[in-house]
Structure formats: structure tokens, C-alpha cells
Amino acid sequence: MPRKGPVAKRDVLPDPLYNSKLVSRLINKMMIDGKKGKSQTILYKSFDIIKERTGNDAMEVFEQALKNIMPVLEVKARRVGGANYQVPVEVRPERRTTLGLRWLVNYARLRGEKTMEERLANEILDAANNTGAAVKKREDTHKMAEANKAFAHYRW
């Protein structure tokens, strides 16, 4: 924690092609070793693949996919009297988006397609259709929260 008070939260600049902060954040999430140009190229090619396959606007498909991935509930560990409980808590909107983007990129990387463009495009398309590993992660997170509903009164 800084001694000089709270650190101001930086706002990302919108992406130049789609004029969207979400796209900028996805580019930053995908970036490895500071290679932003490469990350941008991969994302734009993925969006081209999505547009080609669906015929719809890639941005709309991406937003729908993200909506299907973002969790509403998650569990946090809380120590009470020597026992650790998994306490279900609601996810803040900012964290929802962050988790959604993180899961999208992570599960796209784990896919078996040859190029990252194809992997990302297919993961976005799967998520838009409510299938795929990222959506399964959200479902698992919700199941954990549901299973531990009995400990909800330990919320802080």
C-alpha cells in the first residue's frame, strides 16, 4: 500500500479501429512481453474471422460472448474460528469484466487450433453461443457459490 494516499486508477484509451475500451483491455490482456502491435493484429484477425463466419458485426458477437462469460457470484475464503469457509460474494462490475476478459484469453490459449487468431475467434464464438471453456468456468464459479450459500451470512 502506498504511503501517499490512494493511487488514481488509470483509464485505458479506446481502441483506434473499434473505438472501444473493452477491445483495448482485451488487447492489453493478450499482450505478452509488451508486444502490443502483435496482440492488436491477432485480435483484428480474430474479429475478421468472426465477421466472415457469422456475417454479423464482430463487436456485437464479442460483447455477447463477454456477457455470457462474466460471473455474477464468486466465492472468497473467510477464516472463522480456525476453519476456512468459502463465502459467496457478489462480483463488482469492474471485476466482472476483468475476470471475463482473463478467462476468455486463458481458455483461448489452451485451445487446440493452430493459430491464436483461430483460437480466440472460436472461443469468442463458443462463448457467444453459451458453450466453450470460458462459459464452463463461469458456470463452475456459480456452482461453487450456490453450493456454499449456507455460509453467505459470513459476508463482510
Swiss-Prot record:
Family according to the record: Belongs to the universal ribosomal protein uS7 family.
Lineage: Bacteria, Bacillati, Bacillota, Bacilli, Bacillales
Protein name as annotated: Small ribosomal subunit protein uS7
Entry keyword S-adenosyl-L-methionine: no
Record note on quaternary structure: Part of the 30S ribosomal subunit. Contacts proteins S9 and S11.
Record organism: Bacillus velezensis (strain DSM 23117 / BGSC 10A6 / LMG 26770 / FZB42) (Bacillus amyloliquefaciens subsp. plantarum)
Entry keyword set: Ribonucleoprotein, Ribosomal protein, RNA-binding, rRNA-binding, tRNA-binding
GO molecular-function term, one example from the UniProt record: tRNA binding
GO process terms (BP): translation
Gene Ontology CC terms, in alphabetical order: small ribosomal subunit
Pfam families: Ribosomal_S7 (PF00177)
Role according to the record: One of the primary rRNA binding proteins, it binds directly to 16S rRNA where it nucleates assembly of the head domain of the 30S subunit. Is located at the subunit interface close to the decoding center, probably blocks exit of the E-site tRNA.
Annotated InterPro entries: Ribosomal_uS7, Ribosomal_uS7_bac/org-type, Ribosomal_uS7_CS, Ribosomal_uS7_dom, Ribosomal_uS7_dom_sf
